[in-house]
Amino acid sequence: NGYNIGNFSSYISLNHDRTDGHRPDSKFHITNGFAKLGYKIDDHYKVTGDVSLAKFKNQNPGEITNPLIDNIMNILRGTTSFVLENNYGKTSGALRAFYNWGHHRIDDGYNPGGTPNPYLFYSDDHNAGFLLYQSFRLVKGNSFTVGIDYKNWGGNAWQDSINGNQNELVNKTVNEVAGYVIMQQDLFDKVS
């Protein structure tokens, strides 16, 4: 559903799908949504933001000759971003920020006649950061951009047992920062 009035714009959608699968223990369902809002501040600036979420659960029945019971994945994924853009003709740029994340709960399942797993696998992950840049076009055929990027990504994974004990598998976060200067020059309307 999209909606525009004056300098304001929006788009929102929601979806749900499901199936019982083609075999026992092969169900799947997903619910996801997306929303984007925008506002034109004036002739030079506009701001936008969006968020997307997906929650799904699926079962893996295993091979026909080696079936599985309770091989179930529960997953939540999300992403969001914010952008402030400027455009003055000969110069333009933006501040862009983003955050992506996920939470996973997985049961590896067991074979018929076997014993259920004494633990579940869990993991959380993230990827966040921002970009700040400005481009200048002061001479015909020439573009000069200066900017900085920052990113923080990582996650952790663990096993959670039915008796309450947890076994951490990994927990790591990485920070990255990069500044840059880029110049492009068109040559003979063919090469840049």
Show which residues each predicted segment covers.
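Residues on the lipid-exposed face of transmembrane beta-strands in outer-membrane beta-barrel proteins
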Residues: N1-Y3, A35-Y39, T80-N86, F130-F136, ...
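Surface-exposed extracellular loop regions of Gram-negative outer-membrane beta-barrel proteins
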Residues: G2-T19, S52, G93-N111, S143-W158, ...
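Flexible loop and strand-edge segments within Gram-negative outer membrane beta-barrel domains
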Residues: T19-I30, K40, H44-N127
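Alpha-helix capping and helix-loop boundary segments enriched in small/acidic/polar residues
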Residues: D25, E168-N171
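Gly/His-enriched, cation/cofactor- and phosphate-binding structural elements
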Residues: I162
